[in-house]
């Protein structure tokens, strides 16, 4: 019998979340973001599940794009960080990838390269994130340079990223939007602006393309949920089982450092799954875990391969009882808050030794 820990991936839920993102912005095209192995869900399986819905995909780098091409994904694929070396341009050209451009050296390399066909290019505007891209006062000159290079560049788009769209705090977001609107009008530029939170909460940010990412996988990216974000469905359910039960007297401690101590005679369940699988070691005592569909609290520090829960109030639970660490019935965002982290970290942190089991893989 194999270890019971498994990441159960519901591809129908992924499709429904994508359709929700698409329906939030009916006049935009929605790029499905599948970077970081589809946020830990498996990029090939997720892209294949969306191939009849998504007109394009987005990844961080060339290696991720080539993995999709080798798996038979034929839609356009955007490299969100662009290329890291001019030598990558031959593969970008050969595989008909779209590239972001955020630095002068990339522009120089792109215009020095002789492509078989002009390369679709998305020029990154730093509208306030201050991470990648050209400042507003420098953007137009770069745009004009690329727009004139029709033998090298095609489908030139303005692309940016929002720093605070998740907070529903309008002030900084609207400053970013004002910066974008001025350039967009002067350049008559097609745009890709909205990430997941902007797709869900800021219709004015919906452009020619949107980039839903974490919302596709069922995590609510908004600090304050709205009706649309509440409709998202979990795609990954991290499942396990109780593999042992311990009876503790009052005052006995559990786990490394004895952080949790029984305040009464207690039943402790041991779950297969720990930080060596991607469950966050910083989870606090009381972090919710589902056992037999009921919430029980984490009790003690998470170990590499196991964690422990207090089963005292759930006498029917025992060895073999099903466990959900996050997913169906237990939102990953709630677990993340108990770990002082975010859902992105938990999703992408599920390690390779945890098997992925895909449900509803048929497309259509």
Curated annotation (Swiss-Prot):
Cofactor needs: pyridoxal 5'-phosphate
EC number: 5.1.1.1
Pfam families: Ala_racemase_C, Ala_racemase_N
One annotated GO molecular function: pyridoxal phosphate binding
Enzyme class: isomerase
Pathway recorded for this protein: Amino-acid biosynthesis; D-alanine biosynthesis; D-alanine from L-alanine: step 1/1
Active site location: 35 (proton acceptor), 256 (proton acceptor)
Keywords for the protein's UniProt record, in alphabetical order: Isomerase, Pyridoxal phosphate
InterPro entries (UniProt xref): Ala_racemase, Ala_racemase/Decarboxylase_C, Ala_racemase_C, Ala_racemase_N, Ala_racemase_pyridoxalP-BS, PLP-binding_barrel
Record NCBIfam families: alr (TIGR00492)
Family from the record: Belongs to the alanine racemase family.
Entry-linked HAMAP family: Ala_racemase
Name the UniProt record assigns to this protein: Alanine racemase
Organism annotation: Chromohalobacter salexigens (strain ATCC BAA-138 / DSM 3043 / CIP 106854 / NCIMB 13768 / 1H11)
Name of the encoding gene: alr
